[in-house]
Amino acid sequence: MDQDYEELRAKFTKIGLNETTVKDTLKNKKLSSSLNKVIEETNVGSSGCDRTIGNLLFTLANASLKQKDPKSNAHEAFIASKIVSGDLKTNLQVNAAITYCKDKDTIDESEFDKETGVGVVLTPEQIEQLVGDYVAENKSKILEQRYQLLNPSASALRQHALLKWAPQLEVKQTLDRKFLELLGPKTEQDAAAGKKKGAKAKNSKQKTVDSGKAKEQKIVSEQSKKYNMFEEGFLAKLHKPGGNTQLIPERMKEHLQATGGGVVTRFPPEPNGYLHIGHSKAIAVNFGFARYHNGVCYLRFDDTNPEAEEERYFESIKDLVAWLGFQPYKITYSSDYFDKLYELAEELIKRDKAYVCHCTDAEIKKARGGEERGPRYACVHRDRPIEESLLEFRNMRDGKYQPKEAILRMKQDLSDGNPQMWDLIAYRVLNSPHPRTGDKWKIYPTYDFTHCLVDSFENISHSLCTTEFILSRVSYEWLCNALEVYCPAQREYGRLNVVGTLMSKRKIMKLVKEGYVHGWNDPRLYTLVALRRRGVPPGAILEFVSEVGVTTAVSNIEVARFENCVRKFLENSVPRLMFLPDPIKVTLENLDDSYREQIEIPFNPKDPSMGSRSAFLTKHIYIDRSDFREEASSDFFRLTLGQPVGLFRASHPVVAKRVVKNDEGEPIEIIAEYDASSSKKPKTFIQWVSRDKESNSPVLIAETRLFNNLFKCDNPAALKEQELAAQLNPESEVVLKNSIIEPGIYDLIKSAPWPKTDSSAGVDKAENPESVRFQAMRVGYFCLDEDTKKPNHLVLNRIVSLREDSAKNKN
């Protein structure tokens, strides 16, 4: 036992742990065993390692003990190797690695590196810029709350997509300096505010209810303010046209002459799939920024991968941009510039800034440091003569090489800590025909080569993209400057994620192929075609993007917030109809068979411009089954035997007398009276639909589709493909077959689209069924589905429920 003790003590000491930690660890048998296992997996027990690596291995061993499921430690050796190789340098990265690997059967190393910040090296200048961007975006709040926002700002930056991997002391010092530059030294008022805040915290328990109400009121107040994302935050701080400096000043003169000094942006999707809710932000940012500044925006298809592109994706993207209310200045394609890009590739070779390489993927990875993140070195082809690379590149063009036998690489800077400078691939061989150029080309440019150069060709003033491309800004500028062309300004904002939804093309494709959803436009998905079919108006999506705002931080938004934004948009902008999901017949026995009372009902009492329609109260009407109970109770204010209820807009209440039931004892008809003698106002009013042949009432609904969350879990994005089916919510789609609605629905069909908005809130086509939107009173917001076969086969989709849903069954 003593020998084992001494061996472990020697091992723990060799990895740099201090004496106290070694002693404490040896007292804990489980921790000792776990740490020894980690050391053995990395072979540092005999050779030792520096203290930083040792402490990280200790963190891993300690975390492994806390995992309840043994499977969670399946990739412990892989994480340990990443620590020893220097890929994982901080506790934050190690913890991120543990979280990433927790439920993974296999590890995608490139995805692992992205999720754990491997290779993310921020220079002091980049930290200065990112912190400065954050302070600029929040300037108004900081000026108002001053140093009270310092600590919350530091917390926010610790969650930043890139800054969280940076040295936190350096980030904090930079933030402190930025606050000092903006606010000056702390004043007595700042100190008093801090004390006041502390005093409030001590009394918080006594004020829980009041503070909760105040917080709720504040949220409501803040949501009611109209936010313009182009006047505040990230987009308001962008440079003016001409404000991005050039390596060659003459290029800026040429650019401004071509653009007239205006804003020029672009939305550059890859036509390899359907757009999702996250893309709506990119559309709104790029097209909206140009529109706000009276500039222009290109719709440019980045069609450089013919193996994944299909015509249906091109058409869908065009259609959705128009649906969101934007008109491209021009629709262009990266393939439009293939000839020009090829010429510049040859020029890059002639400038000794590119070379043809024949290395395999594995050889390239190893030369970039490999899994061990060792030293980087040039491959044997890097210094080949210019003439030789030029000849080989032309051989690639002429089809003399098969895929992966030859590539063109940019000759960048392998010593740079940024992976985007490690001789990126510019051209590769592909044998697939292109949708637009056919078999003309055997080689195709990569995104890294194409994107910045086409931005340059189109004189883009603001190349706006998400923060995943921050590191790419260096290679973007390097290539433009290497060729001495105009260099647009790339600027990055945080992407939009709607939590609880699935965005992965691969995973959605699995659901589609296996029949779990009804295609890419299934209303339970968050693709834009699905949201459109569900009935979400384009203007509501734009309002949502604007409300969330544009900053450099990733926006992780709950589905509930998105749906609330849709509700607010629809509340006063669509007509209202009486709709009964589950109708039951009511016979008013004191009325004649010929009784027909005309009642004029506005489509929306808050907006007379929507007009009105006539409803006819007759002897036979229908109410919703949920609005009737045989026995009264103190919390139920609708119709019971003994409790009258008002009919919406009708002159008098109804009084239930008795119930007719079927053989199973279920109510199938209510016998009631229309009580003209009553002068007492009912406690509540319910919707109703008459049986009236003259007005073709009621209108039968073939299907009413109610949509709920597709998955049972809160984070389906974290599921593996094989786990998706088990987590599907069996109640995600509920179909009702016997619903009815009043004939006013036909008035809405004739006068669609609803709501009536200008093009800044999107463009609905009247002939599209989803443009017929309305509020089903006390039920929710609905639209017609594309399965509708007018006029006698109507299918409804619920867009969102009403806020009152949770309380409906109580009163």
UniProtKB/Swiss-Prot annotation:
Disulfide bond positions: none
**E.C. designation(s):** 6.1.1.18
Any Pfam family: tRNA-synt_1c_C2
Q: Which PROSITE patterns match?
A: AA_TRNA_LIGASE_I
**Predominant location category:** cytoplasm
Question: SUPFAM superfamilies annotated for this entry?
Answer: Nucleotidylyl transferase (SSF52374), Ribosomal protein L25-like (SSF50715)
Q: Which UniProt keywords apply?
A: Aminoacyl-tRNA synthetase, ATP-binding, Cytoplasm, Ligase, Nucleotide-binding, Protein biosynthesis
Renumbered to this chain, motif 'HIGH' region spans 269-279
GO MF annotations in UniProt = ATP binding; glutamine-tRNA ligase activity
Instruction: Please list the residue ranges that the record marks as compositionally biased, kind Basic residues.
Output: 194-205
Q: Give a yes or no for keyword Protease in this entry.
A: no
Q: Which residues bind ATP?
A: 270-272, 276-282, 466, 495-496, 503-505
Q: Which GO terms describe its cellular component?
A: cytosol
Subcellular location(s) of the protein: Cytoplasm
From the UniProt record, list the reaction(s) this protein catalyses.
Answer: tRNA(Gln) + L-glutamine + ATP = L-glutaminyl-tRNA(Gln) + AMP + diphosphate
Q: Which residues bind L-glutamine?
A: D302, Y447
Q: Where is the composition biased (Basic and acidic residues)?
A: 207-217
Which family does the similarity line name? Belongs to the class-I aminoacyl-tRNA synthetase family.
Q: What is this protein called?
A: Probable glutamine--tRNA ligase
Q: Which organism is it from?
A: Schizosaccharomyces pombe (strain 972 / ATCC 24843) (Fission yeast)
In the UniProt record, what gene is named as encoding this protein?
qrs1
